[in-house]
């Protein structure tokens, strides 16, 4: 087969991910592999996409080979997906088999894979295999064996001529443009400051939603338009930020100032984005990737966060999951999420107003919602990586994690360890085993009942 590898790394040839597809090329010499550094050359693809599309047309199999970048693909790879659709060229991909191969540290790799699967299936491709490699897997013989087995199965499936059926739902069209009503009754901002960031161009529905929030909030609010914000380029994956959280772009454009000054000053942060394909725009993604100047540290601790979204978010469960992940990781509280899905100005206005009120109220009482699996699981992945292999070059993260007690490994819980060791020994004695098992449900609620009892007897107990 002629196999075309579409590389998603901004590092081009120096991509870790491409080492995995090259390994497959070595193990399966009967197939002809060709690489294109799509993300690294997206600026030239903006001018000339034709050559690449000709290669796609000739290919028997297309491999989307990409690194994870903030729950998704890199902004430049995202831009490539947009270009194909803007120029109505997706028919070149239709009817072809696709493989997805990602490398990462497995922090929300599933959302990136789901995004690329959705895009490939939207273009009429059949996804014959999905592989999520840890970035260092290739050095382990067991992982090489696994990848080789994947290749054998996936290439056979791709060559069979039978395309697997699609697993993602087609994305719904969206043509609604919100236009606000005049004269909003203001929310009392109680001295709080709001930062509103949008990728909505003037005249778009999402821009109008962002501006509406600003008007309602009154007081101290600032709107950052990502279309006007100077951005020299996307994250280059150079990891210089790992040492001291200084981005290689420095203050040569406007991104660092938004994260370092405007975001830090704000009490309420509003992200106002329009859905573009299955995510936000590549412009928004460029800004989001550059958030990595704070590497693996939360950058919105204690802030209230509001999302304003234009588009059918309820049909994009994957994107909804990314929103939760991002905010649970950022340390902020997702106070409200408003979309223009009601397609009704008055209802959307009410929802925006409700969001502003909710954010103020949550801030007043200092509410932070507990994290779900997205935040709890993700924090454990980072904790273990920064403690271990990634301590260098992520020196600044290690410092932060130590200072903020992020190294909460279970092996430090001596009391719990002693108790479970004792119980594990005692359970071998039949009489004790019977007694424990009979009363297991009671054992589990006993400590909670004790708390309730102390509150009942002294209601002042926190
Ligand atoms: C800015 C940035 C963002 C990243 N985001 C994620 C992420 O969300 N999840 C993850 O597991 N790994 C993430 N990574 C790790 C890379 O995906 C991983 O190192 C990958 O193997 C790099 O491959 P490449 O050399 O082909 O670019 C990120 C790395 C960088 C530099």
Task: Locate predicted features.
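Short, conserved, surface-exposed binding loops centered on an aromatic residue
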Residues: 260-263, 297-300, 326
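N-terminal beta1-alpha1-beta2 submodule of the flavodoxin-like/Rossmannoid cofactor-binding fold
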Residues: 1-87, 151-155, 165-293, 350-356, ...
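Ligand-binding pocket scaffold of soluble enzyme catalytic domains
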Residues: 4-7, 307, 342-349
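A charged, well-structured terminal subsegment
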Residues: 121-167, 329-367
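Short, glycine-/small-residue-rich phosphate/pyrophosphate-handling segment
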Residues: 94-135, 301-340
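Short, catalytically relevant binding-site loops at active-site mouths
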Residues: 229, 276-278, 313-314, 342-344
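Surface-exposed acidic, glycine-flexible loop patches that form ligand/cofactor-binding
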Residues: 89-92, 296-299
């Amino acid at each position: 087969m002629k196999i075309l590898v579409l590389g998603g790394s901004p590092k081009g040839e120096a991509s870790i991910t491409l080492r995995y597809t090259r390994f497959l090329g070595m193990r399966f010499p009967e197939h002809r592999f060709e690489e294109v550094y799509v993300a690294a050359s997206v600026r030239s693809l903006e001018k000339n996409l034709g050559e690449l599309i000709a290669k796609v047309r000739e290919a028997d199999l297309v491999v989307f080979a990409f690194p994870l970048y903030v729950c998704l693909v890199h902004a430049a790879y995202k831009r490539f997906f947009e270009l194909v659709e803007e120029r109505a060229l997706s028919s070149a991909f239709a009817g072809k088999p696709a493989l997805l191969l990602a490398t990462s540290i497995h922090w929300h790799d599933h959302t990136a894979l789901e995004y690329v699967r959705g895009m490939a299936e939207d273009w009429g491709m059949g996804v014959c295999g999905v592989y999520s490699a840890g970035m260092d897997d290739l050095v382990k013989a067991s992982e090489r064996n696994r990848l080789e087995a994947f290749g054998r199965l996936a290439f056979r499936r791709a060559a069979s001529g039978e395309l697997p059926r699609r697993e993602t739902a087609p994305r719904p069209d969206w043509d609604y443009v919100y236009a606000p009503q005049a004269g909003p009754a203001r929310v009392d901002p109680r001295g709080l400051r709001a930062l509103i960031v949008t990728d909505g161009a003037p005249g778009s529905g999402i821009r109008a939603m962002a501006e509406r929030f600003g008007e309602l909030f009154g007081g101290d609010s600032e709107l950052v338009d990502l279309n006007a914000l100077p951005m020299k380029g996307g994250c280059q994956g150079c990891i210089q930020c790992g040492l001291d959280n200084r981005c290689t772009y420095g203050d040569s454009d406007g991104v660092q100032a938004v994260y370092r000054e405007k975001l830090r000053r704000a009490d309420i942060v509003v992200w106002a984005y329009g859905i573009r394909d299955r995510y936000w725009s590549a412009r928004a993604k460029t800004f989001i990737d550059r958030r990595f100047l704070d590497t693996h540290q939360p950058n919105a601790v204690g802030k209230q966060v509001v999302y304003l979204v234009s588009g059918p978010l309820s049909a994009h469960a994957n994107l909804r999951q990314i929103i939760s992940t991002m905010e649970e990781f950022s340390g902020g509280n997702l106070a409200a999420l408003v979309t223009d899905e009601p397609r009704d100005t008055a209802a959307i206005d009410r929802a925006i107003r409700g969001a502003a009120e909710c954010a103020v109220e949550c801030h007043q009482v200092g509410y932070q919602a507990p994290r779900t699996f997205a935040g709890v699981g993700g924090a454990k992945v980072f904790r273990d990586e920064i403690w271990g292999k990634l301590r260098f070059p992520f020196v600044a993260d290690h410092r932060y994690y130590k200072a903020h007690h992020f190294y909460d490994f279970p092996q430090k819980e001596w009391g719990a360890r002693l108790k479970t060791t004792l119980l594990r020994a005692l359970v071998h004695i039949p009489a004790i085993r019977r007694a424990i098992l009979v009363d297991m449900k009671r054992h589990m609620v006993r400590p909670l009942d004790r708390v309730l009892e102390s509150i009942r007897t002294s209601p002042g107990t926190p």
